[in-house]
Amino acid sequence: MYYTRDQDLIDDFHLKSGHSAGSIKSYRTVFNKYKKFHNMSLCDLLAEAITEQENRTPENRLTIYDRIISFRDYLIKNHIGNTITDSISKIKTFYHYNRVTIPFIPPLNSKYVSKNDLISFADLPTKDELRLAMQFADDELKMWILVIISSGASRCEAKSMTNRTLFEGTNAYHKKDNFHDALKYLARKNNVVCTCKLIRQKTDKPYYTFLNPECVQRIARIKLRQEDFDLDAPLLKYNINHVNHKFKTLNDYLGFGEVGGYARLRPHMLRKFNSTYLTQGSFEGDLLGMDSVDLLHGRGKNKTRQAYYKDNPDFLKFEYIKAMSNISLYRRYDYNIVKGRVKVISKPL
């Protein structure tokens, strides 16, 4: 069947291949790069390959060979090995699905592929460096930093949060019927933990994570200053491309340097900070196991676990509270259990 719209072609490919939501998203990224690189629609690229096949074009003159090789050369200059291999594999799978015979493609020579340096614990931003970054960041970037440090959310998942996420996730504390009054309450308190129900972008699976008290209080104060009371407005204003630019600019200004070819102060490193410090951040107090951190990051359980074990947000919150001092920049936390409820006790460092 011939299609004139890329989306129809792609939908047919995914439907008949039985791809998961995560696979569909990763294919979308590769298809967009392939189309943009060749400045052609996917329909036209496929039609070109089919025409050559029907015309029995000699293998050494096939355009599809040049297209795949030139695209791979582009990826080699801009990406690391696994990304290159996975991207080319997806393009070849797409052609194969549409019954296009692909000529022999020489294997990738690993000597010419960039390799990221392995990131060690010492490469992570320290708490002192993060406090310094907070001094120089504007209000919007401060919120981004604290949200990712405390929740471990990816940029996309953090960006998906709205003011309603904060309002509803702290309702058990403020018990207000409007966001303005809730913010006034939250701005005064230093012991409120926000429960966030998010969707993991890679898998479309819901999961729970949390914002620690210093993050909640700082956001509340900024929102009050900005008079930002629309519940459906984004919690974090910068778009993803701009926030990357802001992090890079601040990283370079503070001289934090790079590791693995990337700035040390960047969202993904803050996620690593969250994971590492929750599991290994202290010789004192409580730490979380890797399985618990995986739950807080939305990383999936296997299918059997997923079928039988459901996440209890109150239990996850209790586990998080016990360990959240490890990812806090300004305060340390203890807790009491009063009448079956966990009460957080906040103390300055």
Model-assigned labels for residue ranges:
Residues 8-118:
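N-terminal core-binding DNA-recognition domain of tyrosine recombinases/integrases
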Residues 195, 200-221, 229-251, 266:
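C-terminal catalytic core of Y-nucleophile DNA break-rejoin enzymes
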Residues 315-349:
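C-terminal secondary-structure termini that scaffold catalytic or DNA-interacting sites
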